[in-house]
Amino acid sequence: TKLVVNDVSFQVRSGEIVCIAGIDGNGQTELVHAITGLGETAGGRILINGRDVTKKSIRARNTHGLSHIPEDRHKHGLVLDYNLAYNLVLQQYFEPGFQHWGFLKNEEIYKYADKLIEDFDIRSGEGADTITRSMSGGNQQKAIVAREISRDHDILLAVQPTRGLDVGAIEYIHRELVKQRDAGTAILLISLELDEVMNLSDRILVMFEGT
């Protein structure tokens, strides 16, 4: 069996943006899947705040401090046929503030969603009731960014966070990433955009053929 990612070791510290750059197809996607729990690992360890999460579920990694802006917002970031409110609590709906004995607290969910929509200027036709599929790509991405950086987290994994977006949305997301870094978040950025890499990164790592 060929190892797609082999002998990769690095740390991301609080208050810095570390970028993994390189040509697409050199193991970046598999590395992301290993970190987030979307894929299994053949060996090695993944630590968040010193805690080994290598065998933990996706939810456990999220509750241990990992936020994730995925590369494919439709496949891994949103449930397109849910409304915006429910998408904004996808990572938190099970918390006591949003449910009681398994029953969702819709009033609290909508109150939280309305705040994020205002704070992050997410534009949608019907506010929190908007079906997410009907929103522009830029506003879908804003919704993911809002959700992931508004909940408790220590590390933010941002994978191609501006792919396919217009200039205004790109600048907005870059500002939010810098704000997060300045607030002490550890950010791991995976990007193929050279300008993005050079403008945002405190440190740059390059992957080639899985290493």
Q: What residue ranges belong to the model's regions?
A:
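Glycine-rich phosphate-binding loops of nucleotide-dependent enzymes
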Residues: 1-211
